[in-house]
Design a protein with these regions (language model features):
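Catalytic phosphate/metal-binding cores of nucleic-acid and nucleotide-processing enzymes, i.e., regions
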Residues: 1-81
Length: 81
């Protein structure tokens, strides 16, 4: 199973704010930050975009870290109720 890390990239002279999603193999996507969405939704969209780019299927669940968020694929049998 893959994990996806998403992090916020602040604006520069050349780019507005962005969210970058990466995996441990170096695959990545960078998405513009949509100010009409909240931070969770922006991070989630970037994680989903990377998963789609790589052809990965499944349900993603995310949690916050000091650097952004980490997303993992979950199965219902592992759900804690």
């Amino acid at each position: 199973m893959k994990a996806i890390e998403t992090k916020y990239l602040g604006p520069t002279k050349y780019h507005g704010s962005r969210i970058k999603a990466t995996d441990n193999d170096g695959n990545s996507v960078t998405m513009p930050y949509d100010c009409e969405l909240n931070s969770y939704e922006n991070y989630r969209l970037a994680a989903v975009a990377l998963a789609e780019k790589m052809g990965w299927k499944g349900n993603l669940s995310g949690g916050y870290t000091k650097k952004g968020m980490v997303w993992v694929f979950v199965r219902d049998i592992y759900a804690i109720v």
